Amino acid sequence: KDFIAINGTTGEIFVNPTEEECVELGELKEKLKQEKEELEKYKNKETKTIDGHKVELLSNIGVPEDTELVISNTAEGVGLFRSEFLYMNSENFPTEEQQFMAYKKIAQKLQNKKVVIRTLDIGGDKDLKYMELPKEQNPFLGYRAIRICLDNIALFKTQIRAILRASAFGNLSIMLPMVSSIEELREAKDIIEDVKKELEKQNIAFKKDIKIGIMVEIPSTAIMAEEFGKECDFFSIGTNDLI
């Protein structure tokens, strides 16, 4: 039998590590433990700058169960719920009801804390096994995220209906990924308005003034920030893609 050790920070795998490698990994484990213990001291402290400005410290999560960590680490809410994991962890497109229950669970668990739900962000390095995407030379800047949703309006509407319905149970916001033009943003907002009208006709409760924001992760969007600011309620800087 082989003995395997893993460095979770670098992704390195050691098969039958030497005594020296075991010592090094043990020291790394202890160092990480100490760093975590050091951070624990700040859990219940107020988050503000030296000159007194309040700063919201929000978590990024990928599944509803992560809300337990949000609460235990005293975060002030969720700045990014990666809804694509609901799709990636499913054998088929999640239904409106399945999504609604997931978003509702997060909203209720966090009560009135802010929760920002990013709409489906696939493409690039994130694929769905049940949805075929075109092969591209540079998929990170190609057919992905909001572009896929605007081409598949029924898919987009299903998710928006679920988010809006769940917004009746907490402080939810909608965030649109990889928006590259004002036209894309306006088209998405029009679809959201259409869904609102449908829900009103069906007498289904939702937060009528739900905030809509965008991810700024394309250089052209960053350059046009002032124009985009007139069309949406907030930005989230997507440094991974932007840089």
What are these regions (language model features)?
Residues T10, P17, G26:
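Beta-strand/loop-dominated core regions that host nucleotide or nucleotide-derived cofactor-binding catalytic loops
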Residues K1, V15-P17, M88-N92:
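Short, charged, surface-exposed secondary-structure boundary motifs
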Residues K1-G8:
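Conformationally flexible catalytic loops at phosphate/diphosphate-handling active centers
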Residues E35-I243:
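Conserved alpha/beta-domain cores
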